[in-house]
């Protein structure tokens, strides 16, 4: 078994963790349950042959039923943590900002649809491997079908690792440096 959830504890709270302008100006905290092994797969495709046009990105977050169930479990765990006696001095009574009240399946589903966002570790848009969906050769990190182009970042990871991607990306970069220098 490998972990399928990670909990990010933040010393700020907001409905959108990336919109600092809308964060309340008083004490609070957030627990973000994060999927470590998502099954949902999005797409990145070219809008046109023009270099100055942004690609079409469809993340398809939570399109896999298993991801929705895992995240619901994570939300319940986070709520249990916040409501535990260890957090009594950190919240006002039993106050939770959202979703408030009874946690029905509908309330949890609505919150997931409104508040889900990508947190820190997107991978796989230039997957390395030998299968038909692989873009990069795992032995050279070169993009198949193009000359002179390697991908050296988290986008070559076929799947997100259970944990933060920084150390793995450093290892990918070290391998790429060895490949380039040994040429």
Residue spans for each PLM region:
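FAD-dependent oxidoreductase catalytic-site/capping-region signature
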Residues: 1-168, 176-183
